[in-house]
């Protein structure tokens, strides 16, 4: 197992360049999917390796419930600096699990409150809340709905309203809430993945912007709607529920919409900075997966041999 058990804990650093460059050089749809996949793989691998270290660390504690053979020198020799690393991993894994559980619970609570706020309103794909505060967001579920306040609608013209609805429907169609939830939990599992969470928050909004521009047939109208909504909007309901103007740097989104639409299937050459960043992130995720698999299989074999029959 050796040092391979530590690699997945730091390999998320290999994804930092792609988090910076993908949002600028790739189509938002491609960037969102790529970054979400990389973040998910790296988070799972780093958490798995923490768990392996916890097993070794727990076996050294007096009175632990694990088999006595698991504290043998052969087991401890599988992990460099086993005494320090094993015991440090115990509070680290506990913090990861608590943080992810807290994030998932908050997401579920926001979803429940959002659904409860629609009680008594007519069923349909669009729900208009009689609230003077301007906001709009996509609420996924068994029956996907676009939720918008009366205050938001009052501040937009007819064409801008169409852009708003197209944007939110794009969030629902693309299941962007799943991407946001994955990167949000991944960043809680490993703080080195926070740049990917920030990048996906932006690229998911850009993805919806581009789909909305196609739906309404005017990039300028969508840009104008985003700008006006941003000036009116309050804080987002939740970081894992896509909102029209709250997520992502609005000036950058508007500037992107004022340029020609990005190529849908464009992929950077491996000899460009963006291409190297993509391949670097892919290599990091692959090495992380192989390292965690190698560590898990090796430790399993060692523990099996050390377990009395």
Predicted features and spans:
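Hydrophobic transmembrane alpha-helical segments in integral membrane proteins
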Residues: 1-11
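Membrane-interface helix-boundary signature
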Residues: 2, 28-32, 79-85, 267, ...
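Polar-ligand-bearing catalytic/cofactor-coordination segments
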Residues: 14, 18-31, 85, 89, ...
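Transmembrane alpha-helical segments that serve as helix-helix packing and pore/cofactor-lining elements
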Residues: 16-81
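Juxtamembrane extracytosolic/periplasmic "stalk" immediately C-terminal to the first targeting helix
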Residues: 30, 63-70, 115-120, 298-305
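Transmembrane alpha-helices and immediately adjacent membrane-cytoplasm interface residues
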Residues: 45-48, 52-59, 71-116
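C-terminal region of N-terminal signal peptides and the immediate post-cleavage residues
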Residues: 49-62, 102-109, 283-307
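Pan-zinc metallopeptidase signature
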Residues: 252-309
């Amino acid at each position: 197992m050796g040092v391979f058990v530590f690699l997945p804990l730091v390999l998320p650093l290999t994804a930092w360049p792609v988090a910076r460059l993908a949002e600028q050089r790739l189509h938002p749809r491609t960037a969102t999917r790529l970054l979400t996949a990389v973040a998910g793989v790296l988070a799972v691998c780093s958490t798995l390796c923490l768990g392996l270290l916890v097993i070794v660390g727990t076996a050294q504690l007096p009175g632990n419930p694990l088999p006595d053979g698991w504290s043998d020198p052969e087991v401890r020799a599988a992990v460099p600096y086993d005494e320090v690393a094993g015991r440090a991993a115990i509070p680290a894994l506990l913090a990861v699990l608590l943080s992810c559980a807290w994030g998932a619970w908050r997401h579920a609570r926001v979803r429940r409150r959002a659904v409860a706020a629609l009680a008594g309103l007519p069923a349909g794909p669009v729900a208009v809340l009689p609230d003077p505060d301007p906001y709009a967001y996509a609420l996924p579920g068994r029956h996907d709905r676009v939720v918008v306040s009366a205050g938001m609608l009052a501040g937009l013209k007819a064409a801008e309203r169409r852009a708003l609805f197209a944007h939110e429907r794009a969030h629902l169609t693309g299941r962007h809430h799943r991407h946001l939830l994955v990167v949000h939990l991944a960043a809680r599992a490993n703080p080195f993945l926070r740049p990917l969470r920030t990048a996906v928050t932006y690229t998911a909004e850009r993805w919806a912007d581009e789909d909305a521009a196609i739906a309404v047939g005017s990039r300028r109208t969508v840009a104008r709607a985003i700008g006006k909504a941003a000036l009116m909007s309050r804080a987002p309901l939740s970081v894992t529920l896509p909102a029209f103007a709250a997520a992502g740097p609005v000036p950058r989104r508007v500037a992107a919409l004022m340029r020609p639409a990005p190529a849908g299937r464009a992929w950077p050459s491996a000899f460009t900075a963006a291409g190297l960043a993509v391949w670097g992130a892919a290599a990091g995720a692959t090495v992380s997966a192989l390292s965690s698999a190698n560590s898990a299989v090796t430790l399993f074999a060692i523990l099996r041999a050390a377990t009395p029959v």
